[in-house]
Curated annotation (Swiss-Prot):
GO terms for biological process: glycerol catabolic process. It catalyses: glycerol + NAD(+) = dihydroxyacetone + NADH + H(+). Its main location: cytoplasm. This is NAD-dependent glycerol dehydrogenase. The active site is at residue 160. NAD(+) binds at residues 18-47, 164. It comes from the Bacteria.
Amino acid sequence: MTFKGFDKDFNITDKVAVVTGAASGIGKAMAELFSEKGAYVVLLDIKEDVKDVAAQINPSRTLALQVDITKKENIEKVVAEIKKVYPKIDILANSAGVALLEKAEDLPEEYWDKTMELNLKGSFLMAQIIGREMIATGGGKIVNMASQASVIALDKHVAYCASKAAIVSMTQVLAMEWAPYNINVNAISPTVILTELGKKAWAGQVGEDMKKLIPAGRFGYPEEVAACALFLVSDAASLITGENLIIDGGYTIK
């Protein structure tokens, strides 16, 4: 591949991008940016208001589907619906997830199960089923949302840390297995991101204490994560696969 210039290499015009967790937070930011950069965007979320988000972004170039991605049959039905509208899927951005926090000795079993089911199983099933489509149609780009918790230990995050570390390992295996099919698979590991949930979880002194541990001195914004995702799903990142891009203001280098 030769460098074609920024306008072409970073261009995703008319690509079909599927984004999970698209009703809010990082997923919503990715859906908005992908659409702004010319992609057709399929927004998936278990919340019904994903349809309102799609309407706000671009009604003529988006498709919103309400789905629980922890069930294989649900994803298969969604992919069938997508194929009625678009000839192929070029991009998958896995952003759906949950954080249920408790000390390890007190963690309810259902917290563990729900975390693994959505964060890990849901992301795998999405990648598996859409990966098959990409193999059949000549390739694609997959971005899995991990976390700084994939590489460091965080208090009360035992289930979350385990699920996100597994996401990175899964990403590496998928990248290795699917490279011959022209499929790039990468992960993104953000620090605390100022989504609505992030703002609530890290409000007050706990947030101020956390920021003191970040060399950059601040938390991140959903748009910053979306920009990195855009790079990874563009031709500019065609030789990058199996990587875990850490977006944490230097937190994990300390």
